[in-house]
Amino acid sequence: MTRALPIPLTFASFADVEALLRTFETTPCDEPGLTELDHGLQCAEALRKMAPDDVGLQVAGLLHDVAHGACHIDAHHEVGADALEPLFGSRIAQLVRLHVDAKRYLVATRPAYRARLSPISMQSLMAQGGAMSDDEVAGFEARPWWREGLRLRVADEAAKVIGQPTSGLDHWLPLVRSVCAGPGGARA
């Protein structure tokens, strides 16, 4: 589970994001039996069910672990958000950034949530600071899009089912393109 220290991760265009997602088809996920793409697709699908009209949230779900492999697991949300923001804007970047703290928030505010965590998530929770303090909870609730960040986190935890059918990457790429403001994106 431990990875190297953060290295720069940048995307110059939609094509760069697509290329990385395609490598995730064969990149093992920390969750046994899944690839990084399996996990991202399951997360996006769960968010499509929770928030069918929020394509940005769904895309954030697909991309939330984009920095896995590029940095230490504890920093992947920051590295990923920083890499995505130039192409996808502040909302999608913030949602990616929030997904780690959202786990800490949910464990602090909903005690039953801890029981839903996989062993890998429990291990990373401890490395990421454990349950939030009351002050951290208040700070989290002051951040933009924090409620959507909770949805992303719930979907993230649910997206760990070996063999779960999902729409494939080719289904999701036009949606990713539709919210991309960089070269090759629909909002460019």
Locate each region found by the language model.
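Metal-dependent phosphohydrolase cores
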Residues: 1-188
